[in-house]
Amino acid sequence: MAEYEVIVIGGGPVGLFGTFYSGLRDMKVLLIDSQDELGGQLVTLYPEKMVYDVGGFAGIQAYDLAQRLIEQAKMFGPDIRTREWADTLEKTQDGMWVVKTDKGGEYKTKTVMIAAGIGKITPSRLGAKGEVEYENKGVYYTVRRKSEFQGKRVLIVGGGDSAVDWALTLAPIAKEVTLIHRRDQFRAHERSVKEMFEVAKVYTWHELKEVKGDGNRVTQAIIFDNRTKEEKTLNVDAVIISIGHKGDLGNMLKWGLNMKGRDIVVNGKMETNLPGVYAVGDIASVEGMPKLALIAVGFGQAAIASSVAKKYVDPNASVFAGHSSEMDKFKK
């Protein structure tokens, strides 16, 4: 059975950085991810979306950010297993952990870093009439290629960051962008909301009732005011339903972790209630701290978890190993 000092579960941005930092701390690392390719939501959901809230970049395309993180994660030669789902976590008699996967893999490790985000992702659906019928025929749940919306009349449903960001992203290339939200308050950055009102038609207190088409593609959408019930028919070529995604954590919920809803509870050292097991990123809920689901926050958590794990593996090691600019690893 292969043996490691740390197994990182989850190949999104935080897991990738945790893989890099664990390698920086000279630990033998295995990264396990259930997707076909590394990068998490940056790659699977919005590869062409611009990311602005990561330090060092005034703006970077999600796919490009993922590629840089993957390159960084591979610097110290970690083992990587994609298309494998971490199924069980078991404690051995010698105090180590064994991670078993759905593909029959068994991996022994001294520590585990869980960076699983919200788990396996599926889009949240509205249940509007015609929604399923026209899925991938004009009804979408994310934007993988902006070019598909060039010159089209686009309706966006949602009021969060993703919905607002897609309105801003598509406005310059689409023929027309309309956004509807069931409330009049948006769960997005204030500046982005302000800019959205300048470039898109916005209907607050409105919901999607029905998607219509000619059998091959979307041609219309019926929306309604949820206060007055008044309906309005819009001529559209595409409907983007951006109301979030559902995550499946699978058997992780049975691992004996202290959970708060769907989050794993950790202390300031990113330690869970299981010795040698840490949680970072969107899946972690730090006691006494506000939750900010930001990549930048996850990077810091991953560095903390890696450093604390190093001390767990080697009690003589320092938690803080110094600045990377001073390390021999990077001196040529």
UniProtKB/Swiss-Prot annotation:
One of its GO terms (molecular function) is flavin adenine dinucleotide binding. Binds 1 FAD per subunit. Its EC number is 1.18.1.2. FAD binds at D33, Q41, Y46, A86, I121, D282, S325. Keywords: FAD, Flavoprotein, NADP, Oxidoreductase. InterPro entries: FAD/NAD-bd_sf (IPR036188), FAD/NAD-binding_dom (IPR023753), Fd--NADP_Rdtase_type_2 (IPR022890), Ferredoxin-NADP_redctase_2 (IPR050097). It catalyses: 2 reduced [2Fe-2S]-[ferredoxin] + NADP(+) + H(+) = 2 oxidized [2Fe-2S]-[ferredoxin] + NADPH. Its cofactor is FAD. It comes from the Archaea. It holds the Pfam family Pyr_redox_2. Homodimer. Belongs to the ferredoxin--NADP reductase type 2 family. PANTHER family: THIOREDOXIN REDUCTASE 1-RELATED-RELATED (PTHR48105). This is Ferredoxin--NADP reductase. It comes from Metallosphaera sedula (strain ATCC 51363 / DSM 5348 / JCM 9185 / NBRC 15509 / TH2).
